[in-house]
Structure formats: C-alpha cells, structure tokens
Amino acid sequence: HGDLVDEQAHAYRLFSWRSVEVANNDVLTVFAGMRLSNDKFSSLLRKYRTLVEAGVDVRTPDGYILRASCIGFTKKLNANRKACYAQQSKREEIRNAMINTMRDLISSKNIADLCTEIISETMEKEIINKCQTIMQIDNVYVTKIKVIKAPVYTVEELKKLHQGRTVQK
C-alpha cells in the first residue's frame, strides 16, 4: 500500500488485489477489498465517547457488489465535561447519514475511482459534513470494504482496464 499514497502516515489502509491473468511480464489484478490496519483501528477506540458503526451493501456501475463498513465517534465539545455520549435517536440519525452517504458515493463511482476516493478520504469528509446538523462527530473512517460479487472480465477487458496503469519494481 505504500505505493498508493505518498506519505507513510496515511498507509493504514490495506488494499487487497486478486491476480487474474499473467500477460508477458505483467500481472493483471482486480480489486479484492480494503480494511484498516489493526494498529490504526485499535488507536481509534476511546473512552467516554459513543461509537457509531454502519454497514451497507452497494452495487457499483461496473458490476461490483461491495459491503462497506464505516465507524465514527462523537466529538467532545465542552472542555469541562468528561464524557460525550449520544442518545439512541442521534445514533440512529448518524448511522442513517453514514449509510446514505456511502450508498450515494459508492453507487456513482467505478472501482478505480472509488479506490482513489477512499485514499483521499473524501467519503469520510462528506459523512462528517452531513452529520454536522445532527451531532459533532470525528474519527470517521471506512473500516472495511468487502467484495461480495465481482464481475468476470475477459483478458481483453482486463488489458483495457489496466492501460496506462503500471507499478514499477
């Protein structure tokens, strides 16, 4: 994953790629999933905050069916109070906002654009902006994207998908 981002501080997203075809010296791969590293996930957990998790199954325009999971925490606003908990109704509203945002953004992007969007954290920023009116949240991350169903590509389609995209050794 170090090849996907410029800074190692942002290398906590672990992408999985599945090898499909070997053509000459090139290995053609397809997206197989993404998850946060265990170190990053463990560092997010905090006391005196409410954890909100959401998950949704979404179909991309290029035929993938993905299961995306998201996590977020309430943000401490008052410096005098130790805890910052959310009521159940607020948690449900935040969860619905997370689900709707993930569904909208994933269903409108093909898998290559989705990977670049995940790396640039635009989905997380969009979720934080949508939840501003409900309750302040922070540490929002897409924790996992699992491929439920992937389209079957021919060799020609794979070569067309990989045109102009090479990773040097």
What residues fall within each predicted segment?
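Hydrophobic-cavity lipid-handling domains and compact docking modules
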Residues: 1-86
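Positively charged, low-complexity, intrinsically disordered RNA-binding extensions
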Residues: 92-169
